[in-house]
Amino acid sequence: MKRLGINIDHIATVRNARKSSHPDPLVAAKYAIKCGANSITIHLREDRRHIKDLDVIRICKEKKIPLNLEISLNHKILKIALKNNPNYICLVPENRKEITTEGGLNLSKNLNKIKDIIIKFKNKNIRTSL
């Protein structure tokens, strides 16, 4: 079965560029689901360049919106994810100098840390991918 996930990061990019509360990522997420999307993807970056902590909180509270939260291995970001219980977590590399995610996770360097993170999410019934 084909499933459609919509990434709404750039809704937040426009909002932040306008220094406004609009467009609202939560409204965009609800609209995407209403129009047939199966899930929403957002990336909470360490620098918060688009999605903010409050966006994660608000979207996670909407249980009708299946959320795939992309996060780095940063402990502060992990705490936010664990506290808000998204449906899915995708662990992604992050480099502050990059414009968008480039490359992959260094599994050999971070294997034990990644294993520990996956166990934490599994214990909360949050599916995790790399």
How would you describe each model-predicted region?
Residues 76-77, 83-130:
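Conserved anion-binding
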